[in-house]
Regions:
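Intrinsic-disorder-linked linear interaction elements in eukaryotic regulatory proteins
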Residues: 1-200
Length: 200
């Protein structure tokens, strides 16, 4: 068996925090590469191993009380691992598994950052896209709206990072036959796109 396929889940205390962080990074990178090559089984295995290491680093800690930079970084690794697995499950149509991971990731981010942070907006956007895939339009709209509000508050009304939400929100509105609202979203996205291009 390849060393990278051997059991990697050893307690943080026995291996040392630094070694676990190095292993987490290596596993995450292997998973990304497998994902890009559409080797989803391998990607899932690596992402799961990375998640277990990240969980080990946060054992007996609480995100809301993560005062030290090291503790916050450990929880940030955990949120990344959860989001990575959620995105993979989402792509594969494993929606219930994806939602569980996205929800857990969102809960951690709310504890870490509060409810008005750009990192929270990332998760809300991801959850909105998932709700669309599940045809839960009302839930998706609430999530898109909140994600957009947070980004507008922090970035202004003409920032490039608004475009992905506007695009996906418009696609949803088209699907539920709210074409006038969808067109307004599309036109706003186009205006921002033009402003961004002109600023380069």
């Amino acid at each position: 068996m390849d060393a990278s396929e051997s059991q990697v889940v050893v307690s943080s205390s026995s291996r040392g925090r630094d070694a676990d962080i190095v292993s987490w990074q290596a596993l995450s990178e292997e998973a990304y590469k497998a994902f890009e090559r559409k080797r989803y089984v391998q990607a899932e295995e690596r992402f799961q191993d990375a998640l277990k290491l990240a969980e080990g680093l946060t054992t007996a800690k609480h995100a809301a009380k993560a005062a030290s930079p090291e503790d916050r970084q450990d929880f940030e690794r955990l949120t990344k691992s959860l989001n990575n697995l959620a995105a993979l499950y989402h792509l594969q149509g494993k929606y219930e598994m994806a939602e569980a991971m996205y929800d857990r990731c969102l809960d951690l981010k709310l504890d870490l950052y509060g409810d008005d942070h750009l990192e929270v907006a990332v998760n809300l956007h991801n959850l909105a896209a998932l709700q669309c895939a599940k045809l839960r339009w009302e839930k998706a709209e609430i999530l898109y709206t909140r994600a957009l509000e947070i980004r507008e508050k922090h970035l202004g009304n003409e920032h490039a990072d608004l475009m992905p939400i506007l695009k996906n929100y418009a696609i949803m509105l088209r699907k539920i036959k709210r074409d006038d609202e969808a067109q307004a979203m599309e036109e706003r996205k186009s205006r921002i796109e033009s402003l961004v291009a002109a600023a380069k």
